[in-house]
Every structure is written in structure tokens, then in C-alpha cells.
């Protein structure tokens, strides 16, 4: 794609990606304002484009653990990961999948009526179990009439062939997304956060998932200790250029949560964390680097406020989103502005 200096503000045309019935492919050759009016391809816009209505994600707990917690690779997990396995907002695992879905629906009932949902298995590593355990769990979620898609958070080193085959079968019934927690491409940073696998493991997992026609979403943390801004942009650029193409990305502000190893390190020797303005500046640079057709599933993320140690400003999500939207609009920047391939 040729780099362009045009700004989205000079292009009032609204871009509507091709619907599932049009048979046409989206034209991402020029910077556009997407269907929700934003200059980046938000998850909300993509969901509405695909399903014709607003879709909510329901966080579920499959009752699994993680090889980085059960002693296979380690016992403490990644240093940023809470005791809830990054699924602090998920429904409790001691209830059935259907019961979890209904409880989660009730929590958002004031926001959506007669809607559809993404069943999101979020806590810990959701393919770290035998297929005999996973299949009834995921099948129950997909069978729910209000579930439009299944999303599974996992590690790239926990996708054996029989699990990939299961996910491919489920994907023929309803869309299946696989969310991989990469966080960084830099091996020193990966060792520092105790990620527990090397970059080639991630690369191989993405290739196998894409070969199975599964949707791949990658999590990145911005603000890891001792990483420079240039290194963070290198991670985003790497994902932007990766082949086969990655479908979606989550850009996650580093949250320091009480009860994690990261919080212990921060309290012993505080390290710099982003101010809101610094984070927004970096976020806009990331958006410019991403290909126009990559869906941005997240631009900051949330942690339980009762556990949040830093950065303090991230408690006020509304203030952040308003400030970010204003800064992005005034910058004239748009997704894909600096993307070349």
C-alpha cells in the first residue's frame, strides 16, 4: 500500500465494509472514515458491519488453569496477570456455560435488548485441557441461540493438533476467534514478564490457526517495564506486517494490579508508567501503523478498580476515551496512514 499524506478529515465519505451478502471485498486502498465515524476500524464497527446489529462480549470462565501457573512452565503466571487469570470480569466457573451466559446477559440487559453476543472464554488458558473437556464446553456456548460467535483466550503453546481440529469444526457452525497473548516481540521483555514461550512458537501458532481458517486476535501490552517507545512500535509494526495476516489486535495499557508480581516490583522500586497524554500519543502512532483492514478490538483495557495500583488516571475510562477521541480527531491521523506492504 502506498503511503499517503492525506488526512481522514479531508475525506468525509463513510466506508462500509462489504456485508456478508454483497459478495464484494472491502476497498481499503484509501484512508476512510469507518462505518461508526471513527478513523480506525473498531470492534464495534466490525461487529455491526458483520452482524447488522450491536454485539456484546460476555466474559465466561471455563474452569481451566495455565501451564505458567500449574508448575508445567512456572507457578506464578505472567508478572502482570491477576489471580483471576486476566478474567476478573468473567462469570464464576462453578456454574454451567448456559448459566454463565444468562447471568452475563442480565448484567448488560440495560444496554442491549434482544441482542446477540460473543461468548468469550477469557480466564487463564482456555485450550489447556483435553478435547474431551473442551468440546462440550465450547459446543454448549455455540449452541446458545443468542451467541453469534465464540472467542477463546489462550497461549500459542497450548494449541495441539487435536485442539486445532476441534476449533476448525466449531468454526463451521459459528465464527471462532482465537485470542493470543503475545504482549511483546522482544525476548528480553518476554523473559522479564515470565511469558514462557519464544516468538517462533507464536509465529507457528498463527500460521496453523490461519491454515484452519480461524480468526486470530493478538494482545499487545504497551508500557512494559524497561521497554522503549521504539520497541513497542516495533511490536505493532511486526504484527501489521505479519503473514498470513492477523485479523485483529488488542492494544492494552499496562495496568499494575494489586496481588501480582508486577505490583510487588513496582512497590519495591517504582518504574515509569505512561501519563494519559503519553499513552494517547503512542496509541495514535500505533493506529497509523496498522493495516486498514485489521480490527482494533481494544485501545486501553480495564482492570478491577479495587486492584489498580497504577496508572491512576486509567480509573476514569470515560475521561480517557473522550480525551483520546478529541486528540485523534485533531491530529487528522487514521488507521493505515503509515502502513506499507
Question: What function would you assign to each model-found segment?
Answer:
Residues 78, 140-147, 234-249, 321, ...:
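Structural recognition of alpha->loop->beta junctions
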Residues 108-112, 137-145, 167-175, 207-211, ...:
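Acidic (Asp/Glu)-rich catalytic clusters
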Residues 56-60, 117-119, 150-152, 176-180, ...:
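Hydrophobic faces of well-ordered beta-strands that scaffold small-molecule active sites
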Residues 2-118:
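N-terminal [4Fe-4S]-dependent radical SAM core
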Residues 2-45, 54-56, 255-341:
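Auxiliary Fe-S-binding modules of radical SAM enzymes
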Residues 84-104, 108-131, 146-159, 175-201, ...:
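Core AdoMet radical
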Residues 200-260, 277-300:
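Conserved C-terminal portion of the radical SAM core fold
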Residues 98-105, 134-139, 164-168, 203-206, ...:
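Generic structural signal for well-ordered alpha-helices
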Amino acid at each position: 500500500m502506498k503511503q499517503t499524506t492525506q488526512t481522514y478529515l479531508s475525506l468525509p465519505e463513510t466506508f462500509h465494509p462489504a456485508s456478508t451478502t454483497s459478495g464484494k471485498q472491502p476497498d481499503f486502498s484509501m484512508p476512510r472514515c469507518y462505518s461508526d465515524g471513527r478513523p480506525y476500524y473498531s470492534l464495534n464497527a466490525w461487529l455491526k458491519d458483520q452482524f447488522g446489529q450491536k454485539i456484546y462480549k460476555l466474559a465466561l470462565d471455563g474452569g481451566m488453569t495455565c501451564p505458567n501457573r500449574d508448575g508445567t512452565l512456572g507457578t506464578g503466571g505472567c508478572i502482570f496477570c491477576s489471580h483471576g487469570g486476566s478474567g476478573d470480569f468473567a462469570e464464576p466457573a462453578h456454574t454451567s456455560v448456559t448459566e454463565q451466559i444468562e447471568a452475563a446477559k442480565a448484567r448488560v440487559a440495560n444496554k442491549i435488548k434482544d441482542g446477540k453476543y460473543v461468548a468469550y472464554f477469557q480466564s487463564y488458558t482456555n485450550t489447556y485441557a483435553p478435547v474431551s473437556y473442551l468440546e462440550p464446553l465450547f459446543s454448549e456456548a455455540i449452541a446458545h441461540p443468542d451467541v453469534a460467535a465464540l472467542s477463546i483466550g489462550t497461549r500459542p503453546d497450548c494449541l495441539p493438533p487435536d485442539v486445532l481440529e476441534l476449533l476448525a469444526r466449531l468454526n463451521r457452525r459459528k465464527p471462532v476467534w482465537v485470542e493470543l497473548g503475545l504482549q511483546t516481540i522482544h525476548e528480553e521483555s518476554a523473559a522479564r514478564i515470565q511469558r514462557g514461550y519464544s516468538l517462533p512458537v507464536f509465529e507457528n501458532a498463527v500460521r496453523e490457526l490461519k491454515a484452519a481458517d480461524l480468526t486470530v486476535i493478538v494482545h499487545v501490552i504497551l508500557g512494559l517495564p524497561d521497554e522503549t517507545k521504539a520497541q513497542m512500535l516495533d511490536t505493532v509494526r511486526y504484527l501489521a506486517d505479519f503473514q498470513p495476516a492477523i485479523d485483529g489486535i488488542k492494544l492494552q495499557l499496562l495496568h499494575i494490579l494489586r496481588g501480582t508480581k508486577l505490583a510487588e516490583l513496582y512497590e519495591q522500586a517504582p518504574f515509569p508508567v505512561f501519563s494519559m497524554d503519553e499513552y494517547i500519543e503512542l496509541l495514535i502512532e500505533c493506529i497509523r501503523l496498522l493495516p486498514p483492514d485489521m480490527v482494533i478490538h481494544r485501545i486501553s483495557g480495564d482492570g478491577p478498580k479495587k486492584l489498580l495500583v497504577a496508572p491512576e488516571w486509567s480509573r476514569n475510562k470515560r475521561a480517557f476515551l473522550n480525551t483520546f477521541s478529541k486528540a485523534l480527531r485533531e491530529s487528522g491521523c487514521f488507521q493505515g496512514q503509515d502502513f506499507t506492504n
